[in-house]
Structure formats: structure tokens, C-alpha cells
Amino acid sequence: MALVQTHGSRGLHPEASDPGRQPSRRRSRQSSPGAVPEPARARRRRAPATTASGSRAAPTARRASSPPLLTMEAKPLPPAKKKRGTVVTPQGHGTLQAIDVATNGAVEIKYHLDLPRALEKLLQVNRAPPLPTDLTPQRLRTLDSSGLRALVLALRPVRAEVWTCLPRGLVSMTTIEAEEGQADHHDVVQHQMQAPRLHFPLKFLVKGTQVQLVQHVHPVQRCEHCGRLYKHKHECSARRRHFYFHHINSHSSNWWQEIQFFPIGSHPRTERLFLTYDVETYTWMGSFGKQLVPFMLVMKLSGDDRLVELALDLALQLKWDRWHGDPRTFYCVTPEKMAVGQQFRQYRDRLQTALAVDLWTSFLRANPHLADWALEQHGLSDPDELTYEELKKLPHVKGRPRFVELYIVGHNINGFDEIVLAAQVINNRAEVPQPFRITRNFMPRAGKILFNDVTFALPNPAYKKRTDFQLWEQGGCDDIDFKHQFLKVMVRDTFALTHTSLRKAAQAYALPVEKGCCAYKAVNQFYMLGSYRADQDGFPLEEYWKDREEFLLNRELWKQKGQLKYDIIQETLDYCALDVLVTAELVAKLQDSYAHFIRDSVGLPHAHFNIFQRPTISSNSHAIFRQIVYRAEKPSRANLGAGLLAPSHELYDYVRATIRGGRCYPTYIGILDEPLYVYDICGMYASALTHPMPWGTPLSPYERALAVREWQASLDDLGTCISYFDPDLLPGIFTIDADPPDELMLDPLPPFCSRKGGRLCWTNEPLRGEVATSVDLITLHNRGWQVRIVPDELTTVFPEWKCVAREYVQLNIAAKERADKEKNQTMRSIAKLLSNALYGSFATKLDNKKIVFSDQMDEGLLKGISAGTVNIKSSSFLETDNLSAEVMPAFEREYLPQHVALLDSDPEDSEDEQRPAPFYTPPAGTPGHVAYTYKPITFLDVDEGDMCLHTLEKVDPLVDNDRYPSHVASFVLAWTRAFVSEWSGFLYDEDRGVPLEDRPIKSVYGDTDSLFVTQRGHELMETRGKKRIKKNGGKLVFDPNQPDLTWLVECETVCAHCGADAYAPESVFLAPKLYALKSLLCPACGQTSKGNVRAKGHAAEALNYELMVNCYLADAQGADRERFSTSRMSLKRTLASAQPGAHPFTVTETTLTRTLRPWKDRTLAALDAHRLAPYSRSRPNPRNEEVCWIEMP
């Protein structure tokens, strides 16, 4: 029988299992928060206090003494103040519950709070010698973790366990052995003389720096739902489970993140300067192919008058030529390869430097004590030499903050002009004052420069944390919301805000457009060859124009000018300048129109909205959506609250798995000689956005399991259709298995698609391990599929539905209808663009890649690279011949003639393109009689950091997302699949039970939101689908008070004469997005209209109906297919690439040739020579090789 430490300290007990916690006795030792009845207090005061330090005996002594004698002369003593409270015995033990990192199990540690007394009693109980004399109580009470080993060596137990508290509720256990062989010989002899070995183990707890003696350590259980540790049983609330799952659990706490928010508006005092420009290029045959080189640049200045005057003075100072048609328009014309880019770069650098100096001057004027502070604190006589880190420590910063924005604007410049000029103009090393904090946002994407913004920031004295968010709810902001006052230099592309050509954009926004155009082919040939083919007046021949009509129009316009000779360069300059003027007017129109839309249509009069603050229409639409949600929910914080979250890390990929492409495939290949109608869903994504979306923080696993059980019970009832708006079924995203009904019940429009075979296929095969939304579950169930929810820890269930985007869509539809009544083409274009762009912002795909210039890697990126959490995937260097270079005389090096004679002496060692560096004769007055030749050391006016682009990627593949609620895109697509499923019912319900090959053809092609139906399909739409045809009336916006699927279609094939529904009498289908309708015939008036040719990726002007028919017939008969092809000129844009043949920031011209042929790699099974059907059990997908585990009953 061993004597060990137990709960008590007054006896010897054998080693036994711990009886566990005793709640009743523990509660008696706790202090009560409320008042205690008087009898109870009296009993506790009369109880003897044997363990007290002596102070508790004083009241008893006072009660035993007799009261003093009162005399007539003595003043009466004031009544004694009655003490209130509860006298409690100090606790002798503490309890700690934590997770052992070694076993990952939960333990409960009970420890003594008084280390000296606990050690003393323990030694007495076990009849061990007392503590050494040097281990005084005072020394033990002040003992920290650094002296614990010395204590163990002094006590010399058999074994010493040290339990150390770690962050996040963890503990680790280590041991200290005190055997003679492991200790120093002198210490061993000394300890043997002072105290014999203890024959029982000791356990210590280290909390911070404190050391306590452990009484016992027992394993306990841990609740997987709420994280509570317990011995036998416990109760956990829904609130605790929710909090633990989303904030404490290390595995799931980062699955959903709050979406950050800032008001949509800009600061009301923002000063803006717009530099609108356009570039003309010619083709130069270089070492990288046909490279486009700029020879002309025209720019126009607009904005705040003071800033415009500053920019005008700078343009005149740098000797820019002023265009005759406008005093604020300047140009540069030169065929030299780098001259245009260098001149534009010089102007942009000098302009941003002048604006930065102007901002810095106003800061110095507002803080006159800065100069004395810089001299006193940093020993700097000039404040310009301060760094930003030093400047932000300036006390008592004063002044009214300024916010200056410089916009470099053009039409389609991010995909062309900015790339051509990038090697010269991308620079942030302008000579701005040193105290500025310079940051850069550079993001190339899909061959375009999406962001190229540079910010020069100074401290804002008015900045503070906002507590009242009423202004934010109205879309406004003021001085306190900005941490810095700044100068921002931003590149913006009007094409990204209009999605159309400049001429069409001008028409859409009611801007005047000059007639005519320029023969750019002739200009290109003139710069390449020095001449071009022209008539006697110098006017380019017809071969340089698009067609004869364009040739005649432009020649007539030129003759009206009365010029004797055609000046091709001057004409090009005038047309380029006119394009710049139209673009500048478009900039002003966009800025004013969108501000008017936000103020009046959205109802945010205090927003001060600036459309150019964000680069794309998608980013602007998402900002408007967030602002509307913020105004409605009023979260009073800097995020959208817990209602709308963003999936992140593991959940991001899980949610993205539900975002599947649109339906686009033909079910008929060949020539169809029966009537064909085309129906299109009206605003499909907009209508889907008005439907209910998931809302709220996802449920914890326990509540989620209950919701999943409810779902499975409904899915198992195969004979009953489930309502999409059943209040008992919560929205969610699930992993499912699904089996289709009998093949006689299937149709050519499957309700779901799969990527399991490597290609996206709309299939009627069994589904295994697919991720689907709850809307898809209902769609599959109602179509007769048997759906089983597969247990998955990533399964997500939301607490409620909410029409989160309905108000946004309603605002745009109302604005569009009002614009139609007022015939306001501008407002109509804005409302239509914003309505269509929102879905795309939800579906934005994020990754862990980032492209930065070498000099732009901040401290966080450098630490990530050194720690191995960030990898450099590739590095690219700009072309050095695109960078300006100069010879610096101070670094010229002298070469002796004999040294020069040895240079490049062996012709076999040199390449054709490598020419020796130029040699210069020595300057006059060079001493010495020996003839020297000077070879300069050439210096580029760019640092190596400016020349090197790094593509960085995080090692962790999980995406951190706090911007986009991607699950909204998942449900938008799910609602569109529900639309098409209902549409399928109109067409194919009457065919159930008939084999597919025996059914009449009702539809032959589907493309996302459209369906090509035959005459029978048209009749069914006019009867069974009558309520979904727009001309018959109907709603486009979901009504929560009368929940029902809300979508409408309209016939796209309409007569050009009377507007009635028309049909194509003959058509040909070759492949997805490759078809042609011969013509349109109107049954009402009998007129014939022009047909339609759709050929994605091909030159549309080279295709016609007859060519596509011949292509199909040649393929069907086994003839040569190579003659059926189209060619078009293509621009290859390279921004940052690791490919050896692609150089950064180059645009090369190539000829793209595509072969025209019928669909070969089909994603459907063939029924006959023409008809196709989705894959099914009898016609499996040959690409599927995935093995899955199926348990047969």
C-alpha cells in the first residue's frame, strides 16, 4: 500500500481512483453574490477559525469585554458601524482543465494554492523529513519556473512531473529525474547529507511564472460540440455550441469571415485631376515578333481648375505640342521606338511629383513646429529628410487633411496602351519628398492590367475610430475615416466601365461622335515601309479600308475640308485627338451620371459617389450591393455583420464546388429543316438574385445534424414534391449521392451537371460525392431522383432565408423603367450594366498568387519567403531596350588602344544581334600623347527592382476570403437550374415513359439562358408555359409574400418588319457556340428577315450559312476538312510570364487560324446520326474513371 497525495491532508490513504468533483462542498466555499441571511452570518462569525492567521479572534474578544462606564460629563460614543458581508474560508485548492498536447486528451489538474504549506503537510503525511532549512516559506512563495529544477534537486523525489500551461487551453508535461547518475557528484553528496530521497513522486504546475504543487491529474471527457470538459455529464447551450464552433475550434473558426465594409462614397473635398489619353501604334519587326510600337500620343487635361492649371504649366514646360482644336489637349508624334513612352513617363513622373510636393507644402504650412521637432529629435535641418516612420511620431499634428486623386484614363488602355507603354511609364520612384509612405497596387489579370495604383500618404490628424455609423449607412465619409491624407495616382479604363467600343459607348451615353475614321493600315505601312499606296491626291486606296462604303465616306469627308494634299499623319492626329475628346466627355458623363444614379435611384444623397474610385463595373456593382445591405441591416461596425459572411479556407473550395458553368450544348448535330424558335430568359441572373438566399451564421454541428435529418426525411418521401419555400427546411450546402429514375422518365435537360469525368457534363448518370445546394436537392427530388445526404464535416446549414439582393435588383429595374419612359439612354445603360454585373462579383475566383515588383515586397512578404510560407513561382525582367539609358560622364572608363584592339577580335564568339558598344573620341584637351578610346559604362535610369517582376504564391493552398459571399453565387446558379427544370417540365412531361429515341424533337440547343425549340416546343410554350412568357404578363422580381419561382422568357426570333414571333425554316448546328440560322420567316406577315451566325473564336465576317453547311456535309462524307478554316489578327499580350519566348509588357501581333469542323469531343451520347442525349446508365460517360465505394443492400 503506497501513501500518496489525496483530496485531504489529515490522514493516510491507499492509492485509489479519484472520487471526482463534489459540487455541494465546492459551492459552500464560493462567495455569494447576494446578501446572506443574518442567522447564517452570525453562525459563521461564531465558528472558530483554526486556520486563520489570528485576526478572526478579535471580534470574539471585543464581545467578551464589558462596555465602558458612562458618566454625565463624557460624550456618548457613536454607535459602532455594523459590518456586513460573508466570512469565507480561503480556498486551499485550484482546478485547471486543459488539453494535454502529448495525448490530445482532456485532463483536470487539481493543485494547492499555498506551495509551502502543501509541501510541509505532504512531507508530514508521508512521514518524510522536513524541508531543508534553506527552503523557507518566503522563498517557496516567490519561487518561479526558473528555480523549479533546483527545488526538485533539493527534495530529490523518485520522479518529478512538471505540467506547463500553454496558450489556447493547452498543457504539456515534462519530467525531471533526480537519479545519482544524472546529477552532479558534489550536488548528490550534498543532498544526501541534507535530506534523504523522497520515496514518492511530485507533480508541479507552472502557470506563467508561478509554481504550484499538484494534488492529482485525472482524465476528463470533452464535449465535441461546445468544447466543455466534464467528468460524467454536462449541459451545453445552443449559444455556447455556436460560439465554440465559429470562434474557438481551431479547425472551423476560420471557415467563415466577416465581410469588411467602407462607405461607397468618397471624401466630399477630394481634389481630382483627369489625364485622358490615347496612343496610336505601328508594327515593328523585332526579336520577339511583330511588336506594336507607339508613334503618337494625345492627352487631354480636365478636373479641378487649380490642378489643371498646374498640369498645363508642366506640359508647356516640357515642350509638349498643343493641339489646335483644344487648348487643354497636347500631343507627341515621333517614330522613334522609345521616345513616346519616355516622354509620357517623364510627364507623369513630374506631374505626380508636383502634386506630391503641393500636398507636402500644405502639410508643412499647417505644422510649423515640424522643422524644430525634426532638428531636435532627429538632428535633421530639412524636414524633407524625415522618413514616414519618423514623421508619424510627430506630436500635435495639425491641419485640415487633403485628398488628391490623379486619374490616368483611356478607352481599352488596360488591354493595350498601358501594356505598350508599361516599360516606360510604370514607375513609382519619382522624386517625391521622403516623408511620404508609398504603396502600390499592381494586379495584372487575364492579359490586362486590372490595377496600377500608387498612393503617397501622410498622417491624417483628424483620424480616429468611428463610433457613430449613421453617416456610413448613408454612404458618406469624412475626415475621421481616413488614416492618411494622400495623393493617389490611378489608371482607369472606360472600357471596363462600359464593356463596349468607344463609338458604341458614346452612342449609349448620348455623346456626339464625329463621322469617319482613319486608314490605320495605311499608317502602319507608311511607318513600316516609308510609303503606302494612294491616289493622285495622296488618299489611301480602297484596300486599306474596311469596305467600299467606308472608303467613299471618308474620301468625301476629306474633300469637304478643301485640302490639296492628303496628310496621313495630320489626319491620324486629328482622329486620335477627336477620340481623346470623346473619351474625356465620356469620363465626365460617367462620373456625373453614376453620381446622379446613386443619389436619386439608390437614395444616397450624402454618398459623393465617384465611379472611377473602383476600376470595373463589377467592383462598383458589388460596392453598391454592400452599401444597400449595410443601410438595411445597420450593423454599426466596420463590416456587414454576422448575417452575410464570406466562406474561407476549407469552406471556400467547398462552396466553389457548387459554382458550375451554364448549360451550353446541342442535342442535334447537322442540318435541321423544320421551324426553329429561340426563347431567352429575361434577365436570368437578375431574377435569380431576387429569390431567397442563405442568411446568418451557419449552424453548429449539433443543430446542423438535426437540420440534415429533417432534410433526409423529406427526401426519402419520393412520392411527394417538396416546395422550394418550405419553412421547415433550412438552406444549406451538402455532399450528396443521387440516383436517377428509370430511363423512360428522363429527358434531354438534366437537372444537374458533374465534372467527375474531367469535363463539365449535364448528365443523367448516378451522382456520387457531388456538392450541391439545398435548392438543387429539391430540384433533383422533384424530378424523381433519389437523393442521399452524405455525412461531411464541411456540410453547411444556414439558420434562415432572406432576399438579400432583392432591393438592389428592384432599384435597377425601376431605374431602367423610368429611363425608358423619359427616353434617357444614359440611365438605361447604367441600370442594365449594374443589374447584370452583380452576379459576376459574387462568383469572383480568388487565388493565393500575387505579382509584385521586386522593390515592392513589403516586410510581411519577405518574412513569408524566408519562413517558407510564400514561394517565388517565377521572375520576369522587362526588356532593357525599352528602358531609357544615358551615359554618365563621371563613370567613363579609359581604355588603352591595345586593350580596344582585343575587344571582339574573334568573330565566331559574337552573335549577329550583339553589336559592340559605341566608342567615343576623347574630349579636347586630353593630356598625354597616347590616343585613347572611351567606352562608356551605360546606366539605365531604373533600378533592378523596377525591372524584375515576381509571381508569389502562398504555400498553403487554402484561400483567405473576407470580400465575397461566394455562396450567394452558388444559390443564384441553383435558382437558374430550378428555372430550366420547370421549363423542361413544360416540354417533356408528356413524354415520360417513352424511350428517348422514339420521342419527337422539341429542343435542339441550349445556351445558358436560352433554348432553341421546334414547332412542337413552341406550341407547348404557348400553352403549358404560357404564364412564363413575358408578353402575357408576369413578374420578374420575387415576391416574399407570395413565394413562387419567378422567371419569364421571350421569343428572340422576331420579325424585323412587324415584330411578331418568327422562326428559322432551316438551321445547322456544328458544335457548342457554333451554329447558324439561315433566315427568319414571319408566319404573321410572311416577310423574311436576316438569319444569325454564331461562331465563337472565329472571324465572324468570314462565315456564312452556306459555308457552315458545306463544312458539315464535307465532314459527313469524309472529305478534306482543312479548307474550312478562318483567320483573324490577334494581339498577344504579355504582362508577367515565365515562358522563355514571352517577354513582360509586350504586345505582339499574330495571325490566329481556327479550323471549322463539327463537334468531335462530345459530352453527350449519340442516339443516331444527328440526335444526342445526355449520358445515363445505359449510355455511360467514357471519361469517368473515378472509383467510389458503394454498399449494396
From Swiss-Prot:
Q: Which proteins does it associate with, and in what oligomeric form?
A: Heterodimer with the terminal protein; this heterodimer binds to bp 9 to 18 of the genome. Forms a complex with viral pTP, DBP and hosts NFIA and POU2F1/OCT1 for initiation of replication.
- Bias-annotated ranges (Low complexity): 48-68
Broad enzyme group? transferase
> Do you know which InterPro entries this protein is assigned to?
DNA-dir_DNA_pol_B, DNA-dir_DNA_pol_B_adenovir, DNA-dir_DNA_pol_B_CS, DNA-dir_DNA_pol_B_mt/vir, DNA/RNA_pol_sf, DNA_pol_palm_dom_sf, RNaseH-like_sf
What is the reaction catalyzed?
DNA(n) + a 2'-deoxyribonucleoside 5'-triphosphate = DNA(n+1) + diphosphate
- Return one Gene Ontology term, BP aspect: DNA-templated DNA replication
As recorded in Swiss-Prot or TrEMBL, the protein's gene is named: POL
Task: Tell me the keywords, alphabetical order.
Answer: DNA replication, DNA-binding, DNA-directed DNA polymerase, Host nucleus, Nucleotidyltransferase, Transferase, Viral DNA replication
Molecular function in Gene Ontology: 3'-5' exonuclease activity; DNA binding; DNA-directed DNA polymerase activity; nucleotide binding
According to UniProt, the name of this protein is DNA polymerase
| Protein's cellular compartments | Host nucleus
